[in-house]
Regions:
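Conserved redox-cofactor binding core of oxidoreductases
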Residues: 1-126, 147
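Glycine-rich loop(s) and the adjacent beta-strand/alpha-helix scaffold that form part
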Residues: 77-84, 124-127, 131-174
Length: 174
């Protein structure tokens, strides 16, 4: 957990007005992904993805930049933090298990049979198709770029985001 990072909904059961419920992964070395390394989308709006949320000056009472040698080591070794660290680990886990992710696709519907997820309907570059599977991982990101969702679920206006532009709430829509 990231101490002192604001809770999005502190008034909800389990909410913490002082923050501390935001989770993050340690940095992940993207070289472990082999040929998949460059297939992970990087936000054009946040160039320093080599840090973790707890290392940003937003989470510090007295802002202190990460030491230059630490940042340079992470850049040299392509060690990424923030959402990149989570995605890198999830992707590595899939690849280790022989699971090949569908990319450049949008999940549009979950197939539900007998009150359980039985697959997913996908819009891909070659059209719509269905994947039936006993397990489905929705790696759809957040909803930063969906103004209807940000207005409904976040406090105050969100005029811009540093997230990847594909964070449009597809998982929540389903």
């Amino acid at each position: 957990c990231v101490p002192d990072f604001p809770d999005y909904h502190p008034e909800q059961p389990g909410g913490k007005p002082g923050g501390g419920r935001t989770l993050e992964c340690p940095v992940f070395a993207f070289g472990e992904l082999g040929d998949w390394r460059d297939r992970v989308t990087v936000s054009p709006y946040w160039p320093n993805y080599h840090i973790m949320v707890g290392e940003t000056t937003l989470c510090q009472a007295v802002p202190e930049e990460l030491p230059a040698e630490v940042t340079q080591h992470r850049i040299d070794n392509d060690e990424r933090g923030l959402g990149q660290a989570l995605i890198g680990r999830l992707l590595r886990g899939c690849l280790d298990r022989g699971i090949v992710p569908e990319t450049d696709c949008r999940a549009v519907e979950l197939l539900i049979e007998h009150n359980a997820v039985a697959g997913v309907v996908i819009d891909g570059p070659d059209g719509r198709f269905t994947v039936r599977a006993p397990n489905v991982i929705l790696a759809t990101g957040g909803f930063d770029w969906n103004s209807d969702f940000t207005n409904a679920f976040l406090r105050g206006p969100l005029d811009t985001s540093v997230a990847v532009p594909t964070n449009t709430g597809d998982g929540l829509k389903m």
